[in-house]
Amino acid sequence: MELELDLSFFYKTTILPECVLIFCLISILILDLILKIKDKNVFFFISLVSLLLSIFILIFQLKEEPVISFLGNFQADNFNKIFRIFIALCSILCIPLSIDFIKCTKLAITEFLIFLLTATIGGMFLCGANDLITIFVSLECLSLCSYLLSGYTKKDVRSNEAVMKYLLIGGTSSSILAYGFSWLYGLSGGEFQLQKIADGLVSTEMYNSFGSLLALVFIIVGIGFKLSLVPFHQWTPDVYEGSPTPVVAFLSVASKIAGLALLVRLFNIVFPFLPNQWHSLLEISAICSMILGNLVAITQTSMKRMLAYSSISQIGYLMIGLVTGNFDGYTSMIVYLLFYIFMNLGTFACIILFGLRTGTDNIRDYSGLILKDPLLTFSLALCLLSLGGIPPLSGFFGKLYLFWCAWKTGLYFLVFIGLFTSVISIYYYLKIIKLLITTENKEVTSYVQSYTVSSFSLLSKNSIEVSIIICVIASIFLGIFMNPIINILQINLHLNTFTNI
Amino acid sequence: MLEHILSLGAYLFCIGIFGLITSRNMVRALMCLELIFNAVNINLITFSNSFDTQQAKGEIFAIFIIAIAAAEAAIGLAIVLAIYRNKNSTRIDQFNLLKW
């Protein structure tokens, strides 16, 4: 009994960031229940502070040695910690986006925050999960909250349709994943922890059998649905178009970060014997994602749908780093992921602001926006150019490093496809920017005419604008400071034994 | 014996996927989803009985899956209610607002 008490003392610091968030969640619930607070901004403040606190704790924990705690169910090494920081960062950037949106649409604020924080906690646990039960439960914690969030505007028929599709497809994918897990459990002779599964697969001599290949395929299908890799991407545009925009902004980054962390850990630990199989499967899906995502994005007329296809193509680029499979590859993937958070959230923030002031998200209605609001036009253009990878912006440096690492390991075809599709993506991003800026026939659409500009003075900013400014500054200047970021990442990951496998 | 139960699990899994693809009612689709989760449970319990009689981790996983499937079904039924209030039907094929 004493031994367990001692161990539980050790456990506290490994999941302290998540504990802070859980405490914040409970305190928001209780405060909303017992105090009749009219000014709901307090809750936003509480959640932002706790997210910041958990990021700081994680940053200070980066120096610690990797530990496996909770009897092997949770692993905290630097690789996980970086991904957990990214997920908390996404929530911090997404919460300001949702404040004004919720106030305008007159939805309940507390529940929205609770769902968002629970999804964050689920994603953070997923990054560190070290056995199949924890992986499954935290994945479902993330996805169940995402379903609830994407159906949040329940009077809207489009949101209903989106959440229906999301629930059915998400449920199917997680059940397929669980089926793959059950095969892993059986083939390894009854083991659950990732490392023990790998050992068990060796000792039962099943690591090269048809059964383990089957489990691999089921797991790739299950995670591929969550990541919206190409053969499994059908739900993404529909869900993105129907759901409320701040939720889409959160889903488009947080679920991808968590899914990537899961993919890297699971495949490197459990399937080190089948590297060719899973590398080639992921390579095919990366190529398909880049080509199909970029080609279909050209034809879209809705801004959110266009961004959905663009995010499909971005996950293809991130997959390049994963397929590269060495230390540099993972570093480049993490760097690009960091840039992607800022670029994508910046774009979504601009769309939310425009959508709130005009009530449309059709690409056609954006024409001539520069006459009304030059600053919004400027930031949207910068974020889109950064997503496309135009040289001085950070998206360019991220892509360059990604392609360079892949080129060094000899993935020439993948790099070629990546370069070719980036050119296509620049075409459709530039098409939007042209629409924003050109005012040739001097007529603006009725939507832009109804656009009312708030005074852009330093004092009276709303929260979306703060978020836009942070994202735009990050997506312009982070690329210039890329060398220090890479150095920090390499120093921190170097202590870590996992990525050197 | 093992392979018979495993093929029962695979059969249930296939029925569930088939039902999800073809069914036109939201409630029926949710029932098919439960079927897939039950196929997973059958697999886990079989493996647990054969290989892992000491710790019975498979049964524990099965309990977790049952609980999560129940949560998912609850959310699904809530969505069905919300849809029914808006459109007076729960047929999946009548939802075609969002497309290409």
From Swiss-Prot, chain A:
The chain crosses the membrane at residues 15-35, 42-62, 82-102, 107-127, 132-152, 167-187, 210-230, 244-264, 278-298, 307-327, 334-354, 378-398, 410-430, 466-486. It is found in: Plastid, Chloroplast thylakoid membrane. Its EC number is 7.1.1.-. GO terms for cellular component: chloroplast thylakoid membrane. Keywords: Chloroplast, Membrane, NAD, NADP, Plastid, Plastoquinone, Quinone, Thylakoid, Translocase, Transmembrane, Transmembrane helix, Transport. It is a multi-pass membrane protein. This is NAD(P)H-quinone oxidoreductase subunit 2, chloroplastic. It comes from the Eukaryota. NDH is composed of at least 16 different subunits, 5 of which are encoded in the nucleus. NDH shuttles electrons from NAD(P)H:plastoquinone, via FMN and iron-sulfur (Fe-S) centers, to quinones in the photosynthetic chain and possibly in a chloroplast respiratory chain. The immediate electron acceptor for the enzyme in this species is believed to be plastoquinone. Couples the redox reaction to proton translocation, and thus conserves the redox energy in a proton gradient. Pfam families: Ndh2_N, Proton_antipo_M. Belongs to the complex I subunit 2 family. GO terms for molecular function: NADH dehydrogenase (ubiquinone) activity; quinone binding. It catalyses: a plastoquinone + NADH + (n+1) H(+)(in) = a plastoquinol + NAD(+) + n H(+)(out); a plastoquinone + NADPH + (n+1) H(+)(in) = a plastoquinol + NADP(+) + n H(+)(out). It comes from Physcomitrium patens. One of its GO terms (biological process) is photosynthesis, light reaction. Its main location: plastid.
From Swiss-Prot, chain B:
It is found in: Plastid, Chloroplast thylakoid membrane. The keyword Chloroplast applies. It comes from Physcomitrium patens (Spreading-leaved earth moss). This is NAD(P)H-quinone oxidoreductase subunit 4L, chloroplastic. NDH shuttles electrons from NAD(P)H:plastoquinone, via FMN and iron-sulfur (Fe-S) centers, to quinones in the photosynthetic chain and possibly in a chloroplast respiratory chain. The immediate electron acceptor for the enzyme in this species is believed to be plastoquinone. Couples the redox reaction to proton translocation, and thus conserves the redox energy in a proton gradient. Its EC number is 7.1.1.-. It is a multi-pass membrane protein. Belongs to the complex I subunit 4L family.
